[in-house]
Amino acid sequence: MNLYIVTGTTQGLGRALAELIARDAANELVALARSAEGPIPGGAAFEVDLADAAALERACDRVEARIRGKRYEKAVLVNNAGVVAPVAPLDAADPGELARNIAVNLTAPMLLMRRFLRMTEGVAIRRVINISSGAGRRPISGWSAYCAAKAGLDMASRVAALEAQSRGHAVEVVSLAPGVIDTGMQGAVRGASPEQFADVERFRRMKAEGTLRPAADVAADILRLEAAGRLAGEPVADLRELDAGTGIRA
């Protein structure tokens, strides 16, 4: 049996990942999302606000109780949940939205990695896939919190991978930028004004020209590479630069 813990499964990439995982009878899916509505057949769902560290710890306690005593061949954590707001210049950003962005996009994945590594100790194959963004690797006006959080997630992944290697732990960690996906988050971005988000017209053109990838296609690519063990290697990677046949950067 394989264990998959996935966050942000209400919609978008997280939903697509969860549905694909749950289709395989060899997988046990544990979904963490802000809403348990629309349950995924074959999966267990836990409702939690990832911005609330105490609530997240309680949810992890429930997950740990669920999996305690079970034997898994493989355990995979997918930190997918994310928020882009506030979309605004830093001096115009809402303080609460700034704090929530960092909490959901950076603090929550780190807390989940911590608990995942502890609760899956002894599982032969352990993998952490942190869904990052190209925004963590270059500055984008209007996205100060999102860029900072994703850059932090990349570095947290590097450190986690280094610690696993130096301590002889068999854990693969990758912070993966999946490319631009056709999701609700993209819709919110396109609704911003040019004053809030200088690149808004470029994002609107991508939608109009059909260059956004469907979430289901991206999810299938990620899971195919993961199942083949081809996301191992560099702890910070871009799905668009990975050759689907070899898992090696082009």
Residues covered by each model-derived region:
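N-terminal Rossmann NAD(P)H-binding glycine-rich loop of SDR-like oxidoreductase domains
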Residues: T10, G14, A18
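Conserved glycine-rich Rossmann-like NAD(P)H-binding loop of the short-chain dehydrogenase/reductase
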Residues: A22-P39
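Rossmann-fold cofactor-recognition segment
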Residues: P41-A54
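Catalytic Tyr-X3-Lys loop
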Residues: D91-M110, L153
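Active-site helix of classical SDR
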Residues: M113, A149
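Residue(s) in the substrate-gating loop at a strand-loop-helix junction
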Residues: S133
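C-terminal helical subdomain
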Residues: V171, S175-L176, T183, G191-R249
